[in-house]
Swiss-Prot record:
Interacts with LYN and FGR in a cell-type specific manner. It is found in: Cell membrane. It holds the Pfam family CD24. May have a pivotal role in cell differentiation of different cell types. Signaling could be triggered by the binding of a lectin-like ligand to the CD24 carbohydrates, and transduced by the release of second messengers derived from the GPI-anchor. Modulates B-cell activation responses. Promotes AG-dependent proliferation of B-cells, and prevents their terminal differentiation into antibody-forming cells. In association with SIGLEC10 may be involved in the selective suppression of the immune response to danger-associated molecular patterns (DAMPs) such as HMGB1, HSP70 and HSP90. One of its GO terms (biological process) is positive regulation of cytosolic calcium ion concentration. One of its GO terms (cellular component) is membrane. Belongs to the CD24 family. This is Signal transducer CD24. Induction: Expression is lost when primary B-cells are induced to differentiate in antibody-forming cells. Residues 60-80 form a propeptide. It comes from Homo sapiens (Human). It is linked to Multiple sclerosis: A multifactorial, inflammatory, demyelinating disease of the central nervous system. Sclerotic lesions are characterized by perivascular infiltration of monocytes and lymphocytes and appear as indurated areas in pathologic specimens (sclerosis in plaques). The pathological mechanism is regarded as an autoimmune attack of the myelin sheath, mediated by both cellular and humoral immunity. Clinical manifestations include visual loss, extra-ocular movement disorders, paresthesias, loss of sensation, weakness, dysarthria, spasticity, ataxia and bladder dysfunction. Extensively O-glycosylated. InterPro entries: CD24.
Length: 80
């Protein structure tokens, strides 16, 4: 009974780790585009680079996914 509960907890954490970064990515890109549209046109020398924003969001999402995956594996190893 204990192993089944730990397995469910681990799978739940893994599912959360897979779904949470997509929500973080979508909220970061939404706020990034809204702040870019409100900028004045006087700063024409510096154009925003959407590639960097996407890379940073994907990197953060990957890091949080990897962290939660390691935590779930550690819990499974500890309680198995």
């Amino acid at each position: 009974m204990g192993r089944a509960m730990v397995a469910r907890l681990g799978l739940g954490l893994l599912l959360l780790a897979l779904l949470l970064p997509t929500q973080i990515y979508s909220s970061e890109t939404t706020t990034g585009t809204s702040s870019n549209s409100s900028q004045s046109t006087s700063n024409s020398g510096l154009a925003p680079n959407p590639t960097n924003a996407t890379t940073k969001a994907a990197g953060g999402a990957l890091q949080s996914t990897a962290s939660l995956f390691v935590v779930s594996l550690s819990l499974l190893h500890l309680y198995s």
